[in-house]
Structures are given as structure tokens and as C-alpha cells.
Amino acid sequence: VAEAGLDDQIEVDSCGVGDWHVGQLPDSRMRRHGAHRGYRVDHHARQFSAADFDRFDYIIVMDEGNYRAISAKARTQAQADRILRMSDYLDADCGYDSVPDPYYGGDRDFELALDLIEQGCRHLLSQLQRQL
């Protein structure tokens, strides 16, 4: 977003569907792998809130479990329509229909998750640029 010069128009945030890690830093492995790619991964976890529907134009989820959990919090069809899957922005031939949770895996799993997130974000950003 910043590289595209759109950080004054696009706000990006991250949160979890559950309260398991609220207030904690991200997994140390994700921080390490993210840092190797030049990302600052130093935010503290927060749980998704229905108020996020008022704050954000789009809610992007990583997998079907996230989709169901967030959809259950939508108060209107308009809110539900703004919940999108990251997999909708992945290359059709990438072989994944969601972003696998790397938490129980190893280094390769964290790299894969970041690869898929980067790929999806590139396509999502292209779409947003056409809309702005």
C-alpha cells in the first residue's frame, strides 16, 4: 500500500476471530519470517469486533473457519457482502483454496502463508487501485 502511494487512502489492520491471543505479540516465527521479508510484525493481537464492519470497507479472511465466524457477526446482508476470502485473490493455479494456518507447522508453513498472503494482497491492491 505504501509502495503504491496509497497509505493515505487505504488502512490495513489485522485481528483474530477468537480471544486466545488478545494483547500478545504475533507468533515469534511469524515475526521472524516477516522481518526477513521487510515487514514490521509488532502489533498486539486483538479480536474481531462487530464495530469493525463500521470501520472497514472490506473484511478479508484467510479460511472458511474465519469466514463462518466473521459472517456470524454480520448484522446486515450489506456487512456480510463485505466479507471476502483471501483465496478469491490467489492465482487460480496456485493450488490453494485458503491460506493455511502455519501455527502448528514449521518454517515452510510460515513461508507458504506469507507467499499466499503477498500474492493475494497484490491482486487485491490492483482491484482497489481500479476502484479509487
Task: Outline where the language-model segments fall.
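Conserved active-site segments centered on acidic
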Residues: 1-56, 126-132
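A short linear-motif detector with a strong N-terminal bias
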Residues: 38-40, 62-65
